[in-house]
């Protein structure tokens, strides 16, 4: 079991090269907006890679916290619940807006951006599962 957990924790490090990819597309989007010609295709790519990145980040070992801020959140019952509710709302917003956009849009580029929102929502859903595990593993009121 420990080897499997270590394998997935190691696999979670794929998130860091993906951050560079997301940053590349994000910069393209910002530059295109500054030029008053938004690059929707780059936005779609940024959303898709961000969703994949979030998915890989959830492969980390949930029995350990990554930093002091994370530890403070997951050890506190109130802060932990607030974090879980916030992530839940984001998941719903990304999934619902993506599905509505995908199903109601007639333009192909809108469908593509909506698909990117759906992928991000699915990645965030995995993050929510990991956050629930972190909360269960670290909360102080259950020791």
Which positions does each model-derived feature cover?
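Alpha-helical transmembrane segments and their membrane-interface junctions
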Residues: 23-32, 91-115
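Membrane-helix interface/capping segments
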Residues: 58-79
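Generic alpha-helical transmembrane segments
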Residues: 41-63, 120-126
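Juxtamembrane helix-loop boundaries in multi-pass membrane proteins
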Residues: 2-14, 73-90
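Alpha-helical transmembrane segments and their immediate juxtamembrane interface regions
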Residues: 114-143
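Hydrophobic alpha-helical membrane segments
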Residues: 53, 78-103, 119-125
């Amino acid at each position: 079991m420990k080897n499997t957990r270590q394998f997935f924790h190691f696999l979670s490090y794929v998130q860091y090269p993906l951050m560079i990819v997301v940053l590349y597309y994000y910069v393209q989007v910002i530059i295109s907006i500054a030029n008053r010609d938004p690059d929707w295709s780059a936005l779609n790519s940024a959303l898709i890679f961000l969703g994949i990145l979030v998915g890989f980040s959830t492969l980390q070992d949930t029995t350990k916290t990554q930093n002091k801020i994370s530890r403070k959140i997951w050890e506190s019952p109130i802060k932990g619940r607030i974090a879980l509710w916030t992530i839940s709302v984001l998941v719903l917003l990304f999934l619902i807006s993506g599905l509505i956009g995908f199903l109601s849009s007639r333009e192909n580029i809108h469908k593509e951006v909506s698909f990117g929102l759906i992928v991000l929502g699915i990645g965030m859903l995995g993050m929510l599962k990991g956050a629930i595990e972190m909360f269960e593993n670290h909360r102080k009121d259950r020791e």
